[in-house]
């Protein structure tokens, strides 16, 4: 059983994904959290043996105002979720421009063909957003990563 392997050698199983497996909404000035439906591929990790201590690190679909972030982070900790807050504009450049616009086609064998010499130059500005977002994830991981954790 997976838990026997991890309990002997691992303190926590830290699951890092772009998005956390939860949804968040504000009702009557209070945030409510629900697990995303099980059709989400990342949500399937919730099914890993309950004896394994899991910590989730990732972003939320929802944009959280700066003044609400401490409250949201506290609520998410009750779900073993650690948010990486990314500003909306940076998130867009990272996800839609670099990941979906460049990485996804390259990794799925649909490399765009073009004679436009400026095409590759445009990616340089999106590389910066990719680098910054990954740095935010690394900083958050380093805060919570402990000896004997599995990442």
Language-model regions, residue ranges each:
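Conserved nucleotide-sugar donor-binding subdomain of glycosyltransferases
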Residues: 90-151
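N-terminal low-complexity, Ser/Thr- and acidic-residue-enriched intrinsically disordered segments
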Residues: 1-91
């Amino acid at each position: 059983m997976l838990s026997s392997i991890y309990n002997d050698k691992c303190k926590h199983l830290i699951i890092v994904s772009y998005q956390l497996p939860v949804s968040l909404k504000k009702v009557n000035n209070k945030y409510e959290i629900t697990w995303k439906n099980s059709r989400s591929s990342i949500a399937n990790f919730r099914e890993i043996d309950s004896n394994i201590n899991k910590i989730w690190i990732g972003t939320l679909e929802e944009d959280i105002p700066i003044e609400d972030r401490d409250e949201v982070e506290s609520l998410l900790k009750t779900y073993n979720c650690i948010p990486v807050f990314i500003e909306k504009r940076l998130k867009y450049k990272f996800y839609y421009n670099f990941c979906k616009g460049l990485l996804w086609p390259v990794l799925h064998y649909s490399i765009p063909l073009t004679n436009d010499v400026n095409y590759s130059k445009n990616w340089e500005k999106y590389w910066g957003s990719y680098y910054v977002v990954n740095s935010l994830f690394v900083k958050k991981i380093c805060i919570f990563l402990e000896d004997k954790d599995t990442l």
